[in-house]
């Protein structure tokens, strides 16, 4: 809440950018694990649901140990079901924007995470995922969706050596 000046603003997009491997996905997952009062759709274009589950379990155990000093062996932690859903988080491994929008209609989330924007593509643009035109169009479509639906979106994006959003120039 403090970082975002009071929390997620309805209808907004928050871009979390950084170098690959710096911890953007882990930070985001750690944050949404604590948002148990919201239905969250976590869209992953890079990792499998199993990989996300392993990280979430590790984070949940660490957080619980910090809270009450319990050993990791005795903790009840968030666990991923075989369908890919936490209690309040649904994980969708998909890179096609149109399919993501269809899934949003089914899940009716209150927050959406896209990890990462460079992996998402739309049929509206004839270029490869991660290209500047794909990143721009997908981000613009997600912004339009966020504004019309009131659902906040977190976009995770990689930056290059120059410090700009990654993607072919």
Where are the predicted features?
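Conserved lysine of the Walker
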Residues: 24
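Generic recognition of short, well-ordered alpha-helical segments
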Residues: 27, 54, 165-169
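Pre-Walker A adenine-sensing motif
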Residues: 1-7
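Short polybasic/polar patches that bind polyanions
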Residues: 4, 57, 147
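Phosphate-binding/switch region of NTP-binding enzymes
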Residues: 136, 140-169
């Amino acid at each position: 809440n403090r970082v975002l000046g009071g929390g997620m603003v309805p209808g907004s997009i928050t871009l979390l950018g950084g170098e690959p491997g710096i911890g953007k996905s882990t930070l985001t997952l750690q944050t949404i694990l604590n948002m148990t009062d919201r239905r969250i759709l976590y869209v992953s274009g890079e990792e499998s649901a199993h990989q996300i589950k392993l990280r979430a379990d590790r984070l949940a155990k660490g957080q619980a140990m910090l809270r009450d000093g319990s050993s990791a062996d005795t903790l009840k932690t968030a666990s991923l079901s075989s369908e890919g859903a936490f209690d309040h988080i649904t994980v969708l491994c998909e890179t096609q924007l149109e399919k993501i929008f269809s899934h949003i209609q089914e899940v009716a989330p209150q927050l959406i995470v896209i990890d990462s924007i460079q992996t998402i593509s739309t049929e509206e643009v004839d270029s490869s995922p991660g290209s500047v035109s794909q990143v721009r169009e997908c981000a613009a479509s997600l912004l339009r969706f966020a504004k019309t639906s009131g659902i906040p979106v977190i976009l995770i994006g990689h930056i290059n050596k120059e410090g700009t959003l990654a993607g072919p120039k």
